């Protein structure tokens, strides 16, 4: 018994199997007791998979750690932002009083500025009187400058006519150049087409050459196959001859030998004739193709020579045209420079006259604007004076009636004639005044006149308007409301008045009337919403999309101190 391998000697199972003469070992274990190649590959794959899983788990742990760190950073940032918001809120409460002080100071400075402007108005009127003779002189100077400008323009027109003639000639030459360029591009296209045709023919020639080489290769392969077949047949024939030699007589052997030589000779003759015929056919086809390619190349070379001659002729013509164009350009530049010099002199003179005239006109415009402002203020003062006189007369009547009532009836409510006990307070908002009369018990009596207009029917629906004073909302039409001043002699200033539109008791939009909005006696003003088709009118409520006049809507008119002046709603609206 041969000596066993030490590894097998330590494995009793393998030793018994080998001693018993069995060779069917388990898969993956060789007779020497080591793992096979497949088992080793499987072990390597398992080890690689475990390493890859370990790396993925480490990567996931790192990503989780980064995510936790980012969350902590964002929480810290949120805490910092909350602290900043708290500081901003404290600062807002602290600086509110300062903003009020700034507003009061600005108001005082604006009042001072108004007084200064009033002082400047008188001096502006005097300056207007002084500037009138200078304006007359400036107008005369402007007329003379305009006459000079007309003469300069006539000369300029003549020079422009000459320049247009030169430009037309230049344009004609440029068109000739463009025509030559087109012809040149056409020739280039033709040359490129011819070159492409030559490349195509060369490619066909290369293709034919490749085909010929492939045919030769195929013929050689066929010849090799025939030689292999012949050798196979010769081997078979030799085997048959050997068999015939063993099994036949001399006569049969000679017969088979003779027949074999004759068949081999016929096969060789047939192969030689076929190969000669094929070679002759390929040679004739190759010569024919070479002849055709030579003829085409001669034709293309002739066309290319003609194209070269044409290009040379066009280049010479183009050089001549360029020379003429350069001469024309030099002349044009000289004329253009001369025209620019004349234009500069003319513009400089005209600019000086216009500058002086503009300064005078600006001064006059400023004076006119100041006068217009003064006239508006004067009209406002006159209106206020008229209103005060009418209100004084009205209150005199009330006081006379109160005096009569005091002498007729015994009452705790007493209205005396002007005395230290009666106190009147006058409040001015815009151009409207209200007067409060107090009795001896310090009770205020407001003389406000509430006017309730009659109901109106629009589109089979009834609406009602309520007004306090002369300005009220009277109707609506086409997504707009109509405001009327019922006073017959007094205008109203609607600056900063407000219009609030409510739907189902909720405020849906507010519009503030522009500054310097006045409504004259018996005048009607339409205020349109954004949904109105008449957006080109003067007043459009940009903060109110639609005046939805239904049973659940209400439109309220407020003055500049947010006191309710009137409202307009459906008769069934629940206030």
Swiss-Prot record:
Domain LTD residue range list: 459-575
Keywords associated with the record: Coiled coil, Cytoplasm, Intermediate filament
One cellular-component annotation, GO: nuclear envelope
Transmembrane segments: none
PROSITE patterns, per database record: IF_ROD_2, LTD
Annotated segments matching region Linker 1: 89-102
All copies of domain IF rod, residue ranges: 53-406
GO BP terms, alphabetized: heterochromatin formation; nuclear envelope organization; nuclear migration; nuclear pore localization; protein localization to nuclear envelope
Gene3D superfamilies, per the entry: 1.20.5.170, Lamin Tail domain
GO MF terms, alphabetically ordered: structural constituent of cytoskeleton
Chain spans, region Head: 1-56
Region feature (Coil 2): 259-408
Location relative to the cell: Cytoplasm
Annotated region (Coil 1B), positions in chain: 103-240
Region called Linker 12, residue ranges: 241-258
Chain segments carrying region Tail: 409-572
Family listed: Belongs to the intermediate filament family.
Known role: Cytoplasmic intermediate filaments provide mechanical strength to cells. Not essential protein.
The protein's name in its UniProt record: Intermediate filament protein ifd-1
Record organism: Caenorhabditis elegans
């Amino acid at each position: 018994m041969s000596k066993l391998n030490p590894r097998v000697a330590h494995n009793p199972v393998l030793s018994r199997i080998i001693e018993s003469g069995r060779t069917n070992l388990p898969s993956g274990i060789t007779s020497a007791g080591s793992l096979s190649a497949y088992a080793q590959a499987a072990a390597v794959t398992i080890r690689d998979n475990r390493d890859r899983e370990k790396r993925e788990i480490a990567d996931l742990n790192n990503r989780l750690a980064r995510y936790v760190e980012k969350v902590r950073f964002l929480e810290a940032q949120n805490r910092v932002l909350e602290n900043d918001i708290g500081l901003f809120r404290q600062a807002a409460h602290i600086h509110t009083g300062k903003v009020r002080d700034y507003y009061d100071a600005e108001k005082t400075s604006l009042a001072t500025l108004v007084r200064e402007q009033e002082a400047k108005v008188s001096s502006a009127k005097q300056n207007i009187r002084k500037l009138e003779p200078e304006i007359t002189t400036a107008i005369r100077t402007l007329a003379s400058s305009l006459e000079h400008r007309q003469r300069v323009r006539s000369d300029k027109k003549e020079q422009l006519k000459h320049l247009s003639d030169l430009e037309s000639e230049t344009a004609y030459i440029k068109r000739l150049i463009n025509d030559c360029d087109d012809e040149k591009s056409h020739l280039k296209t033709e040359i490129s087409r011819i070159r492409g045709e030559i490349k195509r023919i060369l490619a066909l020639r290369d293709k034919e050459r490749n085909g010929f080489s492939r045919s030769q290769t195929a013929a050689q392969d066929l010849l090799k196959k025939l030689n292999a077949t012949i050798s196979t047949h010769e081997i078979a024939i030799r085997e048959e001859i050997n068999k015939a030699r063993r099994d036949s007589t001399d006569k049969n052997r000679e017969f088979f030998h003779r027949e074999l030589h004759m068949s081999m000779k016929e096969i060789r003759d047939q192969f030689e004739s076929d190969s000669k015929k094929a070679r002759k056919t390929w040679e004739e086809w190759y010569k024919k193709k070479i002849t055709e390619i030579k003829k085409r190349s001669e034709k293309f070379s002739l066309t290319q020579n003609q194209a070269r001659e044409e290009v040379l002729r066009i280049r010479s013509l183009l050089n001549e045209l360029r020379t003429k164009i350069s001469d024309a350009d030099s002349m044009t530049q000289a004329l253009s420079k001369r025209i620019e010099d004349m234009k500069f002199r003319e513009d400089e003179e005209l600019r000086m006259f216009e500058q002086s005239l503009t300064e005078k006109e600006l001064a006059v415009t400023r004076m006119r604007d100041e006068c217009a402002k003064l006239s508006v203020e004067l009209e406002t003062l006159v209106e206020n004076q008229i209103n005060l006189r009418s209100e004084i007369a009205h209150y005199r009547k009330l006081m006379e009636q109160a005096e009569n009532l005091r002498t007729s009836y015994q009452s705790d409510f007493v209205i005396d004639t002007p005395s230290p006990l009666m106190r009147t307070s006058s409040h001015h908002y815009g151009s409207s005044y209200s007067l409060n009369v107090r009795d001896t018990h310090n009770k205020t009596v407001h003389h406000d006149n509430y006017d309730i207009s009659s109901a109106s029917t629009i589109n089979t629906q009834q609406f009602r308007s309520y007004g306090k004073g002369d300005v009220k909302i009277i109707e609506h039409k086409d997504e707009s409301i109509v405001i009327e001043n019922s006073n017959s002699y007094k205008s109203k200033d609607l600056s900063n008045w407000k219009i609030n539109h409510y739907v189902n008791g909720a405020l849906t939009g507010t519009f503030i009337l522009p500054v310097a909005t006045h409504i004259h006696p018996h005048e009607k003003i339409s205020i349109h919403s954004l949904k109105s088709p008449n957006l080109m009118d003067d007043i459009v409520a940009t903060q109110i999309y639609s005046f939805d006049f239904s049973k659940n809507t209400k439109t309220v008119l407020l003055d500049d101190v947010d006191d309710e002046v009137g409202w307009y709603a459906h008769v069934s609206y629940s206030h």
